[in-house]
Amino acid sequence: MTEMDDNHSLSVSRDADGVIVVHGDIDVAGGPILEAALSKTDGTRPVVIDLDDVFFIDSSGLRCLLGAGRRARDRGTSVVLRGVGSEVLRLLEITGTTDQFSIEHRNG
């Protein structure tokens, strides 16, 4: 199932392996859509978020990702950010939060 914000700047879906696939900007408008998808994780295995089609994350989007990481750690698991590009990596580095996630870089 795909969820989309009213401005169509963000869509979130799950693939067959349970990976949360994000398309668009994770900002104040789209953050609640991602938050809703993250709240549906069962907490028994790592949460994998595919960010290959994400080029912008604002502070509210970062808060959403950090909250997911905190909840995962509380349950004894982790959050994997897959397909992280230079724009998103820069935000994580500037904010000193790269250690909160397992990071898999974007190919190419």
Indicate where each model-derived feature is located.
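STAS-like cytosolic regulatory interaction modules
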Residues: 1-56, 67-108
